[in-house]
Curated annotation (Swiss-Prot):
Pfam families named in the record: WD40
Intervals holding WD repeats: 169-206, 451-490, 493-532, 534-569, 572-609, 611-652
Keywords assigned by UniProt, alphabetized: Repeat, WD repeat
Official protein name in the record: F-box and WD repeat domain containing protein 10B
Extra remark: FBXW10B gene is located centromeric to and partially within proximal CMT1A-REP element. CMT1A-REP is a complex binary repeat element flanking a 1.5-Mb DNA region duplicated in Charcot-Marie-Tooth disease type I (CMT1A) or deleted in Hereditary neuropathy (HNPP).
UniProt tissue specificity: Expressed in pancreas, heart and skeletal muscle.
PANTHER family, alphabetized: F-BOX AND WD REPEAT DOMAIN CONTAINING PROTEIN 10B-RELATED, UBIQUITIN LIGASE SPECIFICITY FACTOR/HREP PROTEIN
């Protein structure tokens, strides 16, 4: 068998000639005819243009009407999918481009006569034996460049699966059918016999890899020697297919053997068992489906095909334009003050769910479901088919009027953490050190708090009780005396970085990256209770009855302090929940997915009531007089109506768009912290009371900034603001005659 294989390998080169002859002398036997056809093909094939080469190659491949031959060439051309072959095919050969310009006139002359030669060879090839077809095709593929080989691989794959589907007339699953030629044959006319056997193992292609107990062509299959198996296939074909192939069919026309360009595109585009449904769908449906994917997955889809890449690019552009339009609409809504009375105040009845004894909500006896549009959805429709009761609450258009800004610090620090409790001091941390800033005098207090071995990640200032709490990367919480700066107590127990803290009376709650929420007694420093998540804690809040905590997974959990039990778990966010706020009736959660979600704190009611959309992640949130106040990573503070989700006001916290890390509300003032600055902003008259402008003694109150009140619509550069608009202030803030560059510091935001 090995000798037969070696002779077969050299069969195309058998010649009836002497060693010095360049042209065969005999054209009668099959070997000599094959040699002459190959010789004549070499004369013109490499000199014609690419289109003619492709038409001739595809015409030859279409005459391979044997499933066995198609599978053989498919195995040979598997290397065209390798990375080295793809790299070589994608390279630009400048020398070939220059050569094509020189040979263009010669190609025009060749094209007139070569088409007739191609038709003659195709007619001869169609009536040749399988042995001749196999060897001629092998030598023709040797003359092809990498791009033509890729076309050949795609065409053979398509033809193979088409022939396979035609043979499988019993509607068998083609993945469970194995094709092989029958070993019994007649001496005169051996024809291809095909049978199928069911397999339990899934195979991507028939005859790809047989199990160990099966034999192919009477010999054991060895996956380590694919080339020897291929030669064995050729030797078997020499024995089986020595006769002429009968391909004459009704309506057969030898003039149509040369394939046109449309057929080439259909065949060379590849074939798969699974259709590309995106390509067959209308464009608007394809884009609608791709729009559901996240950006990372959408980038991967662009590598599937050119059509998918075009669709993915259009979806990205649509999403970008949609986000820009939505952001502009929200900004215009927040900047449009007409119809929004900053002094508006009213008492309204708000629905809250009715609860039974076990804390579950009561449903109506005969529910009626109704589909509502986005504009029809509000707080009242959120309790659809739920029994509710009315609770009287007060609403006000807080922070919707004019405002002024006072910059307390203008240093860039992405690790800055601040806390403000409404007094005269603000606690500020930078790395491991903590200091206090007097917002009245706008100067630092000389007391410095040192002792943490790691950076400070959480602060809580209690100015009334004269102490400061700090949580650090060193896993400890420290209790500091404000006047002396001495650490009087250390809370130990966390096994991860302290990320958040909150205080209610003498109960401190802390969360860390150890996935634990701990409740402490501030007076004794003892840990009273521990609650657990499965992911690191990012935010926590406490009141007399409940503790609310959130984690990186996007879950919000409500715990009962006295009973030490989990009341409910709120899920709905697709990103980590970084901020929380709750009162007796409602709970707000802000996440990296750009949503603020409103929930009910009553009993075990777990449905989301409202969702407030932001262009980027939400870093802080609060609820005041039924107005949702949120800080976003795009550098803006937004005020939403809790009833219907409408944005009432958009405030630019800084001109550079730095993320707003946190804010603290006290009366009609907001302390804002972001990466580059933190400022004390005074909102003027949202509750109908104008701040006093009188200064007593040498200490000027913050309300003196009310004299820098702006009545312009929009934002004006500092150079266009009148210097006389700034009244004299003491306390080191501004001199009596403030220059223009000081105005820019005093009035960072100039909105209405």
């Amino acid at each position: 068998m090995e000798n037969l294989e070696s002779r077969l390998k050299n069969a195309p080169y058998f010649r009836c000639e002497k060693g010095t002859d360049s042209i065969p002398l005999c054209r009668k036997c099959e070997t000599r005819v094959l040699a002459w056809k190959i010789f004549s093909t070499k004369e013109w094939f490499c000199r014609i243009n690419d289109i003619s080469q492709r038409r001739f190659l595809v015409g030859i491949l279409k005459q391979l009407n044997s499933l066995y031959l198609l599978h053989y060439f498919q195995n040979i051309l598997q290397t065209t999918q390798g990375k080295d072959f793809i790299y070589n095919r994608s390279r630009i050969d400048l020398s070939k481009k220059e050569g094509k310009v020189v040979k263009s006139s010669l190609n025009q002359m060749l094209d007139k006569t070569v088409e007739q030669k191609m038709k003659e060879i195709l007619y001869w090839f169609a009536n040749s034996t399988q042995w001749t077809k196999a060897n001629y095709t092998l030598l023709l593929l040797q003359m092809c460049n990498p791009k033509l080989l890729l076309t050949a691989a795609n065409v053979i794959r398509v033809l193979f699966l088409r022939e396979e589907n035609n043979i499988s007339g019993l509607n068998q699953d083609i993945t469970d059918v194995c094709f092989s030629p029958e070993k019994d044959h007649s001496s005169k006319s051996a024809t291809s016999q095909v049978y199928w056997t069911a397999k339990t193992q899934h195979t991507s292609l028939p005859l790809s890899k047989a199990p160990e107990n099966e034999h192919f062509l009477g010999a054991a299959s060895n996956p380590e020697e694919p080339w020897r198996n291929s030669l064995r296939c050729i030797s078997e074909m020499n024995r089986l297919f020595s006769g002429k192939a009968d391909i004459t069919k009704p309506g057969y026309d030898p003039c149509n053997l040369l394939v046109d360009l449309d057929d080439i595109r259909d065949l060379s585009s590849g074939f798969s068992k699974y259709r590309d449904f995106i390509r067959y769908l209308p464009i608007h449906l394809s884009k609608y489906i791709l729009r559901m994917l996240d950006r990372h997955t959408l980038n991967k889809c662009a590598s599937v095909s050119q059509h998918w890449a075009a669709m993915a690019q259009q979806v990205k552009m649509d999403l970008s334009a949609h986000g820009f339009i939505q952001n502009q609409i929200t900004f215009l809504q927040g900047s449009y003050t007409r119809g929004i009375d900053p002094n508006y105040a009213n008492k309204v009845s708000i629905p809250v769910p009715k609860m039974v004894d076990d804390g579950k909500s009561m449903r109506v006896k005969h529910p009626k479901w109704k589909l509502r549009t986005k504009n029809e959805y509000n707080l009242w429709t959120a309790y659809q088919n739920e029994e509710t009761q009315q609770v009287l609450m007060e609403e006000r258009n807080v922070f919707c009027g004019t405002y002024n800004v006072r910059i307390l610090s203008d240093t860039w620090d992405q690790n800055r953490v601040i806390h403000y409790s409404g007094g005269d001091l603000i606690a500020v941390s930078s790395n491991r050190k903590i200091h206090l800033l007097d917002i009245i005098q706008v100067k630092a207090i000389p007391v410095e708090f040192r002792g943490h071995a790691g950076s400070v990640r959480a602060l809580f200032l209690c100015e009334e009780e004269n102490f400061l709490l700090s949580g650090s990367y060193d896993l400890s919480i420290r209790y500091w005396d404000l006047k002396s700066g001495v650490c009087t107590r250390i809370f130990g127990g966390h096994q991860g970085t302290i990320t958040c803290m909150d205080l209610c009376k003498n109960r401190l709650v802390s969360g860390g990256r150890d996935c634990q929420v701990k409740v402490w007694d501030v007076d004794t420093g003892k840990c009273l209770k521990t609650f657990r998540h499965k992911d690191p804690i990012l935010a926590t809040r406490i009141n007399d009855t409940y503790i609310v905590s959130s984690c990186e997974r996007g879950l919000v959990k409500v715990w009962h302090i006295a009973m030490a039990q989990l009341v409910k778990t709120l899920s709905g966010h697709e990103g980590a929940v970084k901020c929380l706020f709750f009162d007796q009736w409602h709970l707000l959660s802000g996440s990296t997915d750009g949503l603020v979600m409103a929930w009910s704190m009553v009993g075990k009611y777990e449905r989301c009531l409202m969702a407030f959309k932001h262009p980027k992640e939400v870093l802080d949130v609060s609820l005041l007089f039924l107005r949702v106040i949120s800080a976003c990573a795009d550098g803006k503070i937004r005020i939403y109506n809790f009833f219907n989700g409408n944005c009432m006001k958009v405030i630019k916290a800084n001109g550079r768009g730095d993320p707003v890390l946190s804010f603290f509300i006290q009366g009609n003032r907001i302390s804002v912290c972001h990466i580059s600055t933190f400022a004390k902003r005074i909102n003027v008259g949202w509750n109908g009371i104008e701040p006093s402008a009188t200064a007593q003694g040498g200490n000027a109150s913050l309300t003196e900034c009310a004299h820098v009140r702006l009545h312009i619509a929009g934002h004006l550069p500092a150079s266009r603001l009148p210097v006389a608009a700034v009244q004299p202030m003491t306390g080191g803030m501004a001199p009596t005659t403030a220059p223009t560059h000081v105005l820019a510091m005093l009035i960072l935001f100039s909105g209405v």
